[in-house]
């Protein structure tokens, strides 16, 4: 019965956009659940951005940049031409995998989301690295 199911080839650009979208959802949910860590809201009210320290304009700009890049990659993964698209996804996917690895907190849910985020950004790198060549698509 499963042999009758149709399966269409998903373009690599859409796979990359879907992966970056999934990464963003994981970021958002992990940060949201982080608000439930005891003392977290009080530290926010006191102007402390755990685990980075006192909240400053530069700190907020830096964390905004960290969130904006994956958000923009959702669009760029679809809009850019293949060569710059491929290299940008390889570089940023690798960079974000390393950042996630180096910044995982000890709370289990953060580790859980971190493992998923590393898998997703690893898949970004893998799909970009293995971008189909025009000659293989014609066969």
Model-inferred region functions:
Residues 18-21, 36-45, 61-73:
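Hydrophobic, membrane-facing alpha-helical anchors
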Residues 23-58:
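Hydrophobic transmembrane helix segments
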Residues 85, 95-114:
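Membrane-helix boundary connector in multi-pass membrane proteins
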Residues 16-23, 62-66, 88-92, 96, ...:
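Hydrophobic alpha-helical transmembrane segments of polytopic
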Residues 20-31, 70, 74, 93-103, ...:
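Helical transmembrane-bundle signal
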Residues 1-26:
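Cytosolic juxtamembrane helix and N-cap/initiation of the first transmembrane helix
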Residues 121-139:
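Membrane-water interface at the C-terminal end of transmembrane alpha helices
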Residues 67-87:
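Juxtamembrane helix-break-helix junctions at the cytosolic face
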């Amino acid at each position: 019965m499963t042999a009758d199911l149709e399966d269409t080839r998903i373009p690599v650009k859409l796979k990359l956009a879907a992966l970056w979208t999934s990464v963003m959802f994981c970021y958002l949910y992990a940060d949201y659940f982080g608000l439930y860590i005891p003392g977290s809201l009080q530290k926010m009210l006191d102007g402390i951005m755990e685990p980075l320290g006192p909240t400053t304009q530069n700190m907020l700009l830096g964390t905004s940049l960290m969130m904006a890049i994956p958000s923009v990659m959702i669009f760029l993964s679809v809009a850019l031409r293949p060569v710059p698209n491929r290299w940008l996804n390889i570089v940023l996917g690798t960079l974000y995998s390393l950042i996630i690895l180096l910044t995982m907190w000890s709370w289990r849910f953060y580790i859980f989301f971190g493992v998923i985020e590393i898998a997703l950004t690893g898949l970004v790198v893998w799909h970009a690295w293995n971008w189909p060549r025009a000659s293989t698509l014609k066969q």
